[in-house]
């Protein structure tokens, strides 16, 4: 029975992933943030059941690593879609190298959003989508990277990796015309990931993160 449940969950995981891919990529469909979260939660839950349901703890070692790696690849696909292709966020390729879309003044965009909301020029939903969305966009990496890669358990290497990666994304968005290059995006993206990293680091969660890819035993 337990094997049947795991196999059924695996089939449902694949079906959900195909459904998710179709609606994200099919022209004419716009998948909002709420549905993206629902798809991600469903994928993570079903994948977890397919890998762990009824499996003894002693046999879960490699499965933990596989689970986190599959979550990382799914997350990276969702992130790339949101940043470069997603109609829900006005993405698309329009190569132009428009340097007018570059902001290197820290907190300028954040301040402008808050001022515009204060004057009633934009909705609270737009403020949350842009500011809170940027804060949580890279936050999952605060768990996934240190779980999968031992060298990412150093906050210095983790922050350096994220800074380089986010900067590359910002430059690519300007080059492709998919978005702007904004230092405030870097600040919010990095802050969100670091908050999750530090929270895990100072709580018992860190022990479970390290168990995904433990250090080799000496001897």
Where is each model-derived feature located?
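Bulky hydrophobic segments
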Residues: 1-177, 197-219
